Amino acid sequence: MTIQPSDKPLLEWAGDSLAIGLFEDAVELTGELATLDQKFSGVLKELIAEEEFKGKANSTIFTRVNPGRPVRKLILVGLGKPDALKLDTLRRAAAAVARVAKKQKSKILGFSFPLWNNDPAASAQAIAEGVELALYQDIRFKSEPEDKGSQIETVDLLGFSGQEAAITLANQIVSGVNLARELVAAPANAVTPITLAETAQAIAKDYGLQVEILEKEDCEKLGMGAFLGVAQASELPPKFIHLTYKPEGTPKKKLAIIGKGVTFDSGGLNIKGAGSGIETMKMDMGGAAATLGAAKAIAQIKPDVEVHFISAVAENMISGRAMHPGDILTASNGKTIEVNNTDAEGRLTLADALVYAEKLGLDAIVDLATLTGANVIALGDDIAGLYTPDDDVASQIEKAAQTSGEKIWRMPMEEKYFEGLKSGIADMKNTGPRPGGAITAALFLKQFVKETPWAHLDIAGPVWTDKENGYNGAGATGYGVRLLVNWVLGIGE
């Protein structure tokens, strides 16, 4: 599929389907749209009246045009209130149009959308992202894939002449999102610690990044007892992934993105029981997937920022070698941890990853993880939790989320709650009381960052959706990739 800007006037464009964005309660056709309606014998006005179209956000209607016309179908999509127009409004509207056009077997699709904030580059990027994200399909594990039907071949963005770079940026970012989607969606017998390490090596080879894969023996030498405690039960070896992107010249900043990479979480000896959703625990490496997806995108975009992509990857399994409830692990910064729940393993892997990252001399660290069910209880399935003691980093992340349209909410870091993590025989326990569980998880991670500005994103909810939601189909969403890329690009401005 080719997405391209077009300087073709609306009244002269020809193709299979033409999509027009209209604001809520402003669907009266005027100016160029009125002329277009006359050209098509009043079919637009008739369609709006018959369907009682009001322009509500993401609502769509379409009609076929009489044979012999330059356009076969007209699609109207609602954009909501004009004063509420956001980039994500355009992204979601474009996704809705793309699905309609594909269902109608359109090969050539045109968009006539208004600008967000008089910014053609950002608007073109959002529309292109919406189309590409919505049309993604994962059929790798189908023995007889369903008929995909007619595919959209060309998308023209009318009125966006000169915005090739914005569309290219959208392509680069979406390539990272789709990599993350593929990794999260794949079962644990397809994506293992070995697989993720190989994926990192492939990204490095394809895009010129530096890569280092630390094996178990390397991690032992670095004293990564927390990470290795999680990994010790599995027959598969742990892999500590470190990808590095370095720009030409002196970087403006040095950043790290750390992703939780538990490729399957059985819960360990505190095994996940019936009704726990254990069959979904292939997605417990969603943070690592987003990290690798961001690496793929950033390697193509080439910002003036040095970025380290890190993940301590392992399975949390059950065997005669498994860590026991009550075991004491020593992390690589010397902190001792009483494991009172083997199913709170992600924070143990992140602990050593954070210590490792801080030694790189960074300006900021962001980790993201499918860390707690408590965050899902607090914020639901669509919103990630943002935990940080640093207001500047919080503002950067929130700004990036506004651009990407990925929902996030800053949560408190109530230091008093750390009392619940205190241990009688070690420096801390790995879990505290049930109330405030997402906060105590973030406070646990905070013990492994000394001075570097740091933020933790709990993405347990939005990493997956059970049904179609905007530009995400049912399944893995690739949450975090676009947010992280926008964070890095914002730092590099």
Curated annotation (Swiss-Prot):
InterPro entries: Leucine_aapep/pepB (IPR011356), Macro_dom-like (IPR043472), Peptidase_M17_C (IPR000819), Peptidase_M17_leu_NH2_pept (IPR023042), Peptidase_M17_N (IPR008283)
Enzyme superclass (EC): hydrolase
Residues annotated as binding Mn(2+) 1: D265, D343, E345
E.C. numbers: 3.4.11.1, 3.4.11.10
Catalysis performed (reactions): Release of an N-terminal amino acid, Xaa-|-Yaa-, in which Xaa is preferably Leu, but may be other amino acids including Pro although not Arg or Lys, and Yaa may be Pro. Amino acid amides and methyl esters are also readily hydrolyzed, but rates on arylamides are exceedingly low; Release of an N-terminal amino acid, preferentially leucine, but not glutamic or aspartic acids
Positions contributing to Mn(2+) 2 binding: K260, D265, D284, E345
Active site: K272, R347
PROSITE patterns tied to this protein: CYTOSOL_AP
Keyword Mitochondrion belongs to the record: no
Gene Ontology process terms (BP): proteolysis
Family: Belongs to the peptidase M17 family.
HAMAP family in the record: Cytosol_peptidase_M17
Protein name according to UniProt: Probable cytosol aminopeptidase
Protein species of origin: Nostoc punctiforme (strain ATCC 29133 / PCC 73102)
